[in-house]
């Protein structure tokens, strides 16, 4: 019985190790324009950089670090020709659980969100963003059409995420340490974060989406992420 127990634990460890190995790299949706790393977020100037098309990207390292980049068009029911834009960036640590789920825990002070409504405002709201995330399962396979590695994630509620394709291995990421430390004296970041900025998100870009998923579903996704994101508005 003891031998059987040890063998079971060994097999579980092997499965988890191979699962982590399969995740390693940078994955992006089919537009291939949204990619984690310095092309999406500039930590020196503290700004998000607009890609030419919308999309999603995740990067994973073998030692448990991750980074994510989102650029989504959110449908506007009153003015369909004028969608809103949401850009998100986070990084932190992840863990693959024994049941195959993935738990992502971001560095709370580093996450950023940019919300833009180019048809109604000439400015966009740039805020700190902190949202833990969980995927119920993941699958890595060779895509039958593109003939490259493909990552399929399912959200915590089993909703399939848009498929992503391996674009870099090793992953393209920013440093995995805290990029925007908080001052212990004031409790504020060295650079205040809540501010209106000139909107970098254009209507043409938002209309040229990569057509991954139903816009109506992404509307509710955007509302959920904005409402539940633990956004901190830190004023100087």
Curated annotation (Swiss-Prot):
How does this protein lie in the membrane?
Answer: Single-pass type I membrane protein
Q: Spell out the molecular function terms from Gene Ontology.
A: unfolded protein binding
Does this entry carry the keyword Membrane? yes
Q: What Pfam families would the database entry show?
A: Rot1
Alphabetical GO biological process terms: 'de novo' protein folding
Q: Which residues lie on this side of the membrane: Cytoplasmic?
A: 236
Q: Which residues form the signal peptide?
A: 1-17
- Per UniProt, which keywords does this protein have? Endoplasmic reticulum, Glycoprotein, Membrane, Signal, Transmembrane, Transmembrane helix
- Topology, Lumenal side: 18-214
Q: What stretches pass through the bilayer?
A: 215-235
Q: GO cellular component annotations, sorted alphabetically?
A: endoplasmic reticulum membrane
* Function of the molecule: Required for normal levels of the cell wall 1,6-beta-glucan. Involved in a protein folding machinery chaperoning proteins acting in various physiological processes including cell wall synthesis and lysis of autophagic bodies.
Q: So what family is this one in? A: Belongs to the ROT1 family.
Q: What is this protein called?
A: Protein rot1
Q: What organism is recorded for this protein? A: Neosartorya fischeri (strain ATCC 1020 / DSM 3700 / CBS 544.65 / FGSC A1164 / JCM 1740 / NRRL 181 / WB 181)
Gene name, Swiss-Prot/TrEMBL: rot1
């Amino acid at each position: 019985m003891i031998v059987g127990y040890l063998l079971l634990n060994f097999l579980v460890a092997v499965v988890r190790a191979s699962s982590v190995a399969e995740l390693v790299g940078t994955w992006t949706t089919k537009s291939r324009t949204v990619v984690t790393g310095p092309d999406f977020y500039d930590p020196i100037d503290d700004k998000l950089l607009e890609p030419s098309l919308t999309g999603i990207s995740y990067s994973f390292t073998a030692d448990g670090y991750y980074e994510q980049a989102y650029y989504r068009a959110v449908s506007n029911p009153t003015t369909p020709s004028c969608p809103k834009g949401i850009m998100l960036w986070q990084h932190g640590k992840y863990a693959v659980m024994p049941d195959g789920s993935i738990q992502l825990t971001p560095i709370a002070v580093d996450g950023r969100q940019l919300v833009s409504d180019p048809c109604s405002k000439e400015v966009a709201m740039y805020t700190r963003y902190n949202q833990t995330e969980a995927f119920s399962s993941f699958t890595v396979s060779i895509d039958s059409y593109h003939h490259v590695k493909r990552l399929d994630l399912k959200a915590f509620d089993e909703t399939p995420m848009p498929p992503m394709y391996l674009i870099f291995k090793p992953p393209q990421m920013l440093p995995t340490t805290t990029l925007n430390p908080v001052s212990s004296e004031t409790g504020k970041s060295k650079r205040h974060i809540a501010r209106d900025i000139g909107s970098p998100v254009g209507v043409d870009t938002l209309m040229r989406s990569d057509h991954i998923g139903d816009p109506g579903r992404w509307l509710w996704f955007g509302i959920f992420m904005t409402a539940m994101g633990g956004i901190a508005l830190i004023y100087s």
